[in-house]
C-alpha cells in the first residue's frame, strides 16, 4: 500500500519540483518529503527507497538554488521573508508572555524529520499548539543560530549591539 501511495505522490512531487515554489510551498513540500521518508523506512523495498532518495537529492539541489536566490533579500528586508529563526521569539513567543503560561523547549540541531520521530513520545506529555517549519540563518552552526534565536538578531546585529559579549567562532 505504501509503495503504490508513494508512486502516486512521486508524480505530484515531481511536478511541484518542476514549478517555481515560494517559501511556503517549499515548507509544505519538505513536510511531504519527511512524511514519505518515514513511511518508506518501514518497508523493505530498496528500489522504492532509491527512487525516493533521487527525488530528495533533486529537491535539495533546487532548494539550495531557491535559498541562493532569496536569502539575502530576506535578511536585508528587501523582500517579504518567511518565518526565520532570529524572529521566532518576537513573532511567535513574545505575544503570549505575561498572558498565559508559556514554555519553550529548544532542542539544538533538531531537524523536522527528527522531530517527527520523537513527536509521538512527547505528545504523551505535552499538547502541541502549533507546528511550523521555520528557516534558519546561514551559517546554521549552533554558535550563530542559537544566539540569533535567543537574541532575536542576526549575528552581525548581535556583534554591533553587544560587541563585548559577541565572539566569532574562531575567537573561542
What label would you give each PLM region?
Residues 1-102, 109-172:
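…; additionally, a secondary subgroup of soluble metalloenzymes is captured
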